[in-house]
Amino acid sequence: MATIFAIETSCDETAAAIVKNRQVCSNVVASQIKIHEQYGGVVPEVASRSHLEMLNQVIAQCLCEANLSWSEIDGIAATCAPGLVGALLVGLTAAKSLAIVRQKPFLGVHHLEGHIYASYLTEPDLQPPFLCLLVSGGHTSLIYVKDCGIYETVGQTRDDAAGEAFDKVARLLQLGYPGGPLIDKLAALGNPQAYPLPEGRISVPGGGYHPYDSSFSGLKTAVLQLVQKLKKQNNSVGADGFLPASTINDIAASFQETVAKSLTKRAIDCALNFGLTTIVVGGGVAANSGLRKHLQAAAAKHNLRVLFPPLKYCTDNAAMIGCAAAEHLQRGHTSPLTLGANSRMAVSDIMELYNSH
């Protein structure tokens, strides 16, 4: 059983965790949401500086909560791709330094593989093959999980990621940042059938549509046009220039319903067509109540098993990175200390991060 000390700094969460196979010994996350809120989104340079300021404190707290010494740690891991390069470098450099000083194996981990492994933390018997629906602020993908490190992307967004669309629509509705939780909250108060919105399908040469790829830019534009149209109707706008709360709730509900149904349809069709009986959901949008409701209901109809990670493992954290690293280390995979940070990297290239022994 491998015990891993892991660091995650790919975007705006400074995180460290200690994981013993699938058991979390400690999991510390310092969020930068309050810092980036004023900008309406993540500012890369600000994120990197904040990681530098917070990381030592997060590492110390992580060790303290686990009540473990370095002699009990088998390997040290950090997210190395994809993400904001400056942010990644902070965690990557810290992990390499610790690996050298403590004389431990080092492992670079792909951020999306971490999200795949988030459900492993609470599902001790989960094993491939299965389908992963990965939905976050930066990614929306359907990934065929064949084995540890062996993945095939069978569907993805052609433009905005689902989480990105939530943030942009929240901005259109003047709700604030981050948009996902805010829209989810208001959607519960609105009518999801109030405004029909386009699903966003991808046409293919020769006719028809791609069965698993998605598009959210058209949906975002449709919401923009709807907001503009409603604002032109004098009775729809208050003296402050804002739409009434009930209208905003209905738009939020209609938007969330459209995204949830679109993702659910593609995930169910994909699992059935590939003969997979389990769908694992990962990423920040996995926390969305609309997606959870639609996917669980549709899966039950088709006798498919759907696994959502606990809410604390949906958003970025280091426990999921440690879980993935533990599996790799047990298979004899380690990374060279020359490994760099990458803003982009396909999940099909993950094994390039490791030397196999």
Descriptions of predicted regions:
Residues 70-80, 274-286, 307:
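Short glycine-rich phosphate-binding loop at a beta-alpha junction
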Residues 185-279, 290-297, 301-302, 349-357:
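A contiguous, well-structured pocket-lining segment that forms one wall/lid of small-molecule binding clefts
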Residues 124, 147-191, 220-229, 234:
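Glycine-rich phosphate-binding loop plus the immediately following alpha-helix
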Residues 108-109, 296-320:
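Conserved phosphate-binding/catalytic loops in two-lobed NTP-binding clefts
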Residues 14-19, 132-134, 140-144:
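Short beta-strand scaffold segments in enzyme catalytic cores
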Residues 1, 109-131:
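Conserved phosphate-binding catalytic cores of ATP/NTP-utilizing and phosphoryl-transfer enzymes
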Residues 2-82, 111, 115, 251:
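N-terminal beta-alpha supersecondary unit
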Residues 309-347:
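Glycine-rich phosphate-binding/hydrolytic loop that grips phosphoryl groups
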